[in-house]
Amino acid sequence: MKITDISGKIETLVDSLRDMSPTRVRSSFSDEHVSENDDERSSWIALHPSALDMFEQIMRDAEGKQIIMFLDYDGTLSLITEDHDRAYITDEMREVVKEVATYFKTAIISGRSTDKVQSFVKLTGIHYAGSHGMDIKGPTNTDQSNQEEVMFQPASDYLPMIDEVVNVLKEKTKSIPGATVEHNKFCLTVHFRRVDETGWAALAEQVRLVLIDYPKLRLTQGRKVLELRPSIKWDKGKALEFLLNSLGIAESKDVLPVYIGDDRTDEDAFKVLCERGQGFGIIVSKTIKETYASYSLQDPSQVKEFLERLVKWKKQTLGE
């Protein structure tokens, strides 16, 4: 990555975070803006209707097809939290996901490390794809269903570098209040959520300097995070395709993949489904954003409701 490209991305990041500052949003708020935003929201909903409102139509489209569930973790199964180490899934959500996995092949694709997601979800019998799909594990084909095997790690050569960069960034950012660096095995995340606006530029500059020293890493942006990951052509969309292939159903016309996620990194998976012309994405968001998703849900509570209705529908089709 060129230094100018890095600088441009950093500047864009700082500008976007500044624009999202609550004080700036409130200071420019007026009745005219409310009306305008309502119109924009209505237009957006028309393009990405609620998956709850459209549930019956979705299920009609699913008749005779094998539904495969792909779920993001943060902001989808769990709430976004100030402390990223405390983004716990509720017992109720865990039980719903367990039921979903009973009736449908299920995978959780997250930017976190696979081990961290597994420690939160605590369910066996499902596929986990951590580090944005760079660390994929799934159930074995043996009778010992509690065992799991590594299926794919396309960035394994980068492990020593990631370990090194995590330590470098922790040292460089320790003087910036609120900044934290999370080791996600095959990528790393710099969290902005607790950093005051006055510290954004300094933090971004430290990330820029690290990227100059480690040109084999690339920069991506998520919800109040910067992420550094290997410069390989791999993302959540590639992970979705890999899982469909590994399950032996990638070429089947009777499969309906459903991906639910809230972050811009999930757009790679939404885009894959659009390009396949098979299945659909559901964006979890209370705000208007550009997306390849077909439907929307507002928050994890609505995700839970959608999954509950999905399980109920399946039980009814089976006569249970």
Swiss-Prot record:
Keyword Hydrolase among UniProt keywords: yes
Transmembrane region(s): none
EC number in record: 3.1.3.12
GO terms assigned for molecular function: trehalose-phosphatase activity
InterPro entries for the chain: HAD-like_sf (IPR036412), HAD-SF_hydro_IIB (IPR006379), HAD_sf (IPR023214), OTSB-like (IPR044651), Trehalose_PPase (IPR003337)
Metabolic or biological pathway: Glycan biosynthesis; trehalose biosynthesis
Record GO biological process: trehalose biosynthetic process
Top EC class for this record: hydrolase
Enzymatic reactions: alpha,alpha-trehalose 6-phosphate + H2O = alpha,alpha-trehalose + phosphate
Keywords (A to Z) from UniProt: Hydrolase, Stress response
Named cofactor requirement(s): a divalent metal cation
Family: Belongs to the trehalose phosphatase family.
NCBIfam families: HAD-SF-IIB, T6PP
Protein function: Removes the phosphate from trehalose 6-phosphate to produce free trehalose. Trehalose accumulation in plant may improve abiotic stress tolerance.
Protein name per its UniProtKB record: Probable trehalose-phosphate phosphatase C
